[in-house]
Amino acid sequence: GGVTETSGSTGPAGRDRRTTDRVARHGLPPAARRVHFVGVGGIGMSGIAEMMSGLGYGVSGSDLTASAVTARLRELGIDVKTGHDARWVSGADAVVVSAAVSDDNSEVVEARRRDLPVIPRGAMLAGLARSRSTVAVTGSHGKSTTSSMVAVVLAECGLDPSAVIGARVAAFGSSTRVGQGPHFVVEADESEPSLLELTPQIAVLTNLEDEHLDHYGTFGRLQDTVARFANRVTETGAVVLCADDPELIRLRERILRRVVTYGLDD
């Protein structure tokens, strides 16, 4: 195997402005101290909740069902309720919502009634990444494994990274790591438009297959989203892609950032 590098032309990364103007440091209003997570039982939401607790925010959450994930959050001192109730928004400065949560959820309705920022999970993750040197990993398969390897290598090198991964990392004992270093490793789900909230320094593309067509409709639209994501990389950054994947090789010509390839045959 090997690694090769090419340079592409640079252009505007483009920015998705869907988040509210009130969103500031860490994607939250400057005075925010307590954040409530609706749908906190998912691996992505729980990881962000755990990270924000580690950063010193007061964190609470709710989910329809109790699980091993919600039990772990409780062990960390996070107040997690089972079911949904408007009362649980009381005291929160902002509310983060899972993609699985509908707009008519009682807690979301109450948050809007109180004029609280209601922040999608992807926007919250992007807010956490904003002040860091971010490595974002996406692809149809291998996201958790690859992002875990990147985070563990950075940690073993003494760089003390933060990470939010879509699976438990044995070396961390969690899907999340809160570090003091500048690096932030995230698993970016290509099935969600929130992929385009991120502006990473490095994007890693593992592979691309015709999945998630229930969301995108066509494989072409999925390809478009991944190409847009790659071009959101900072102009001094790089896109690392697997040269063994034919779809990524075809996508490569649409990438305007510096490209580094890897693979068994590369």
Model-identified regions with their sequence ranges:
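Phosphate-binding loop of NTP-binding sites
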Residues: M51-G54, R74, W88, A99-R258
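N-terminal leader/targeting and accessory segments in enzymes
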Residues: G1-M124, P246
